[in-house]
Amino acid sequence: YTGMIEGAMNLPWQSIPFAQIMSDRFGLPCKITNDANAAAMGEMTYGAAKGMKNFIMITLGTGVGSGIVVDGKVVYGHDGFAGELGHTCAVRGENARPCNCGKVGCLEAYASATGVARTAKEIISSTSKDTLLRALNIDAITSKDVFDAAEKGDEVAKEIFDFTGTILG
């Protein structure tokens, strides 16, 4: 691969020679990959997948991705996008959410951190149930806020995660 960030769905970066910038800055060779592939390499080398030759590492965060390992090697595909689960269509129909990639109904629009926050906003706006989340600015709620409320037994927060989990599978 070229070391170039061709396009980042969640960042305003296009055609950034990131590996070269880092090499120039630190005087060391640099290679780049996405977070899911890096996580898979880390698990294969140091973590729960140590010694495994075939596995999939799912990542949920700003996006939804996976690092796929076959015969002890990360699978990149012909264009480097193997494992990009986030842009798999998970919801169809006129109410499917738009995604940053330009499509609608992508898994990432529901199961990412921003997707969970959006679900929280939608559910809180459509229910009169008590929830710890009402004490927060509805437009500033994060997935961490939902997690914290769920940890405290908040039923609406649990409903938000149930919805997300159903879509995630």
Q: Which residue stretches match the model-derived regions?
A:
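Active-site flanking residues adjacent to catalytic metal/cofactor-binding acidic residues
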Residues: 34, 78
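Short glycine-rich, Thr/Ser-proximal phosphate-binding strand/loop in the N-terminal lobe
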Residues: 4-7, 74, 80
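Short beta-strand-loop/turn "lid" adjacent to the catalytic site in phosphate-handling enzymes
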Residues: 1-15
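Short glycine-aspartate micro-motif
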Residues: 55-59, 65-67, 98-100
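Structural signature of FAD isoalloxazine-binding scaffolds in flavoprotein oxidoreductases
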Residues: 81-86
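Active-site glycine-centered loops adjacent to acidic/histidine catalytic or metal-binding residues
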Residues: 35, 61
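Adenylate-forming
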Residues: 40-45, 66-68, 87-88
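ATP-binding/phosphotransfer module of carbohydrate and carboxylate kinases, centering on a glycine-rich
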Residues: 1-2, 18-30, 42-53, 74, ...
